[in-house]
Amino acid sequence: MEKNLYRIAGCNEAGKTTASFTILPEILNCKEFVNADEIAKGISPFQPEKVSFEAGRIMLNRINELLNSNQNFAFETTLATKTYKSKILNAQKKGYNVTLLFFWLQNVDLAIERVRIRVLEGGHNIENEIIKRRYINGIKNLFNIYIPIVNEILIFDNSEAKHQLIAEKLNQTEINILDSIKFNQIKNYFYESEK
């Protein structure tokens, strides 16, 4: 039986969690979803940002448990750090097929605005500078690290109400670009960050 690891990625408020609750159980038949934000809410529902470090540690431990027990699972990340590269390579050595689902927003201002709305609705805040840093680093790591190493990737524009597939890489093939204008927009952010 094939083992699957799904990495749900994108900047803050790109719609990762919302999409995960539909895509994972209903389409991919994946019942294990590890999410540091949800863990933090479980520890401190009214101030989850105060326990983010502890939630991250619990998340890493849970990922290790799932890998060691050869279970299908997914986890959420902004891709802003290189932390999970070794986890992905380790999973592949253990026979996992690793799929990255990347949810992109057309600009960082949209991410900032969505976080602002989330706060007005009672959600946790993230400073604008952190959102900007994660947005750029996520795109940079997408191209520098993760596109080359994952088995499969789906890149979506999630700026509007309905997400749109921009590019895909299936079964270790070359990346197939379905919307070259939007894919080039993402690459332009990457090239700008490399200067």
Task: Specify the residue positions occupied by each region the protein language model found.
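Glycine-rich phosphate-binding loop used to anchor ATP phosphates in small-molecule kinases
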Residues: 54-105, 138, 154
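ATP-binding Walker
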Residues: 14
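P-loop (Walker A) phosphate-binding loop of NTP-binding proteins
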Residues: 11
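NTP-dependent small-molecule kinase module
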Residues: 144-195
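Conserved substrate/cofactor phosphate-moiety recognition/catalytic segment
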Residues: 20-71
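A glycine- and Lys/Arg-enriched "phosphate-lid" helix/loop adjacent to the NTP-binding pocket
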Residues: 96-145
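Walker A/P-loop
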Residues: 17
